Design a protein with these regions (language model features):
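Hydrophobic packing residues in well-ordered alpha-helices of helical domains and bundles
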Residues: 7, 11, 36, 40, ...
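Short terminal alpha-helical segments
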Residues: 2-35
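Surface-exposed, polar/charged faces of alpha-helical domains
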Residues: 2, 27-34, 57-61, 79-89, ...
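Amphipathic, well-ordered alpha-helical segments in soluble domains
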Residues: 10-21, 39-46, 69, 73-76, ...
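Amphipathic alpha-helical interaction modules
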Residues: 25-72
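Amphipathic alpha-helical binding modules
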Residues: 76-110
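Extended interaction regions within the primary functional domain
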Residues: 19, 56-59, 96, 103
Length: 110
């Protein structure tokens, strides 16, 4: 298991990636499906909540559960991105990067 402080540091980087993904979605404007927009908004909102939870979490199970929830939202965003077909390449890259970072963190915690 990674140390709680190491998880928090990694999460700070992931949160920046999620924020960049959200900004890319906004820049893409009307060219983004509602499904993808909703997935990105949920992930962005949940990451803000998760930051607070991770700051307070002391036990490994709470940290793991928080990361698992985020990774599941990352899966949903990736799936929505794939269903969207022809979307902005920068947005697609941001979604895939956020998904990959969340997946890596999850696997390191299990």
């Amino acid at each position: 298991m990674m140390q709680a402080e190491e998880v928090r540091q990694r999460f700070t980087q992931i949160e920046q990636t999620i924020h960049q993904m959200s900004e890319a979605c906004q820049r893409a404007g009307g060219n983004v499906s509602n499904d993808l927009k909703n997935s990105i908004q949920q992930l962005d909102q949940r990451s803000g909540q998760a930051r607070q939870e991770l700051q307070q979490a002391q036990d490994e199970e709470a940290i793991r559960q928080c990361v698992d929830e985020l990774e599941e939202l990352g899966d949903q965003a990736k799936a929505a991105c794939e269903r969207s077909g022809n979307i902005d390449q920068q947005l697609k890259n941001a979604v895939l990067q956020a998904h990959q970072e969340l997946s890596q963190l999850k696997h390191q915690l299990h």
